[in-house]
C-alpha cells in the first residue's frame, strides 16, 4: 500500500489499510501496536478451541471488535490522561457464569462517564 492511500496507517515505514466491512463493530483510528516478536499465542488459543474472546488495551484511540478464526478480538479505547488524542473511555464486559462463551460489552466514553448520566 502506498503513502497517501485514504484510510491507510503507517507502521514501521510500511502502509496498511483494513478492508471495508472487516470490523464487526467499533473504529480503527490508528495502527495497532503489536509486539515485534512472534510468540504464537493466538495460534495456541485457536488450537485450544475454548477461547471465546480476548480483550486488549493500550492503543489509545481504537475501540473495535473483530472475530478471527472463531475468537473475538476486542480492542478497548484508552482511559489514561497522560497520552495523545482527546477521546477517553472504558469498556464494560458482562459475563454470565452459566453461559461462559457469551458476553456483552459496551464502550463508555468520557463525556458519558462524567456528565452524570451513568
Residue ranges and their predicted role:
Residues 1-59:
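His/acidic metal-ligating clusters that form di-metal
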Residues 26-27, 32-48, 62-118:
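Binuclear metal-dependent phosphoesterase catalytic core
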